[in-house]
UniProtKB/Swiss-Prot annotation:
<keyword id="KW-0732">Signal</keyword>
<dbReference type="InterPro" id="IPR000528">
    <property type="entry name" value="Plant_nsLTP"/>
</dbReference>
<feature type="disulfide bond">
    <location>
        <begin position="76"/>
        <end position="115"/>
    </location>
</feature>
<feature type="disulfide bond">
    <location>
        <begin position="56"/>
        <end position="101"/>
    </location>
</feature>
<keyword id="KW-0813">Transport</keyword>
<dbReference type="InterPro" id="IPR016140">
    <property type="entry name" value="Bifunc_inhib/LTP/seed_store"/>
</dbReference>
<feature type="signal peptide">
    <location>
        <begin position="1"/>
        <end position="25"/>
    </location>
</feature>
<dbReference type="GO" id="GO:0008289">
    <property type="term" value="F:lipid binding"/>
</dbReference>
<keyword id="KW-1015">Disulfide bond</keyword>
<comment type="similarity">
    <text>Belongs to the plant LTP family.</text>
</comment>
<protein>
    <recommendedName>
        <fullName>Non-specific lipid-transfer protein 2</fullName>
    </recommendedName>
</protein>
<feature type="disulfide bond">
    <location>
        <begin position="39"/>
        <end position="55"/>
    </location>
</feature>
<dbReference type="Pfam" id="PF00234">
    <property type="entry name" value="Tryp_alpha_amyl"/>
</dbReference>
<comment type="function">
    <text>Plant non-specific lipid-transfer proteins transfer phospholipids as well as galactolipids across membranes. May play a role in wax or cutin deposition in the cell walls of expanding epidermal cells and certain secretory tissues.</text>
</comment>
<dbReference type="InterPro" id="IPR036312">
    <property type="entry name" value="Bifun_inhib/LTP/seed_sf"/>
</dbReference>
<dbReference type="GO" id="GO:0006869">
    <property type="term" value="P:lipid transport"/>
</dbReference>
<keyword id="KW-0445">Lipid transport</keyword>
Length: 120
């Protein structure tokens, strides 16, 4: 089970690196997935779970790294791609993650988010 989880995580990271929008964004999906790797158990947990401190540290680090509109759009696309790749994803936990970590982002972490509309 642990080996298959590790393999799934490696596959997820590889998919995100290949799919990452390379255009003008300096923020890569590898960075996003590395920052948010500690969040995987929370994202698969039942409703009302609490994210572990390393997860929130990664969320805050990612927020600090995404300083330009292209970076924020790239991070959004990476999050969207990752959300679609996580088996047993609890969409309520994904949407609640920023707030539970004490940060605010102007979009929902979801497979249906239109990342091209992010402008700030």
């Amino acid at each position: 089970m642990a080996t298959s989880m590790k393999l799934a995580c490696v596959a997820l990271v590889m998919c995100m690196v290949v799919i990452a929008p390379m255009a003008e964004a300096a923020l890569s999906c590898g960075t996003v997935s590395g920052d948010l790797a500690p969040c995987l158990t929370y994202l698969q947990a039942p409703n009302n779970a609490s994210p572990p401190p390393p997860c929130c540290a990664g969320v805050k680090k990612l927020l600090g790294a995404a300083t330009t509109t292209p970076d924020r759009q790239a991070a959004c696309n990476c999050l969207k791609s990752a959300a679609g790749s996580i088996s047993r994803l609890n969409t309520n936990n994904a949407a609640a993650l920023p707030g539970k970590c004490g940060v605010s982002i102007p979009y929902k972490i979801s497979t249906s988010t239109n990342c091209n509309t992010i402008k700030f």
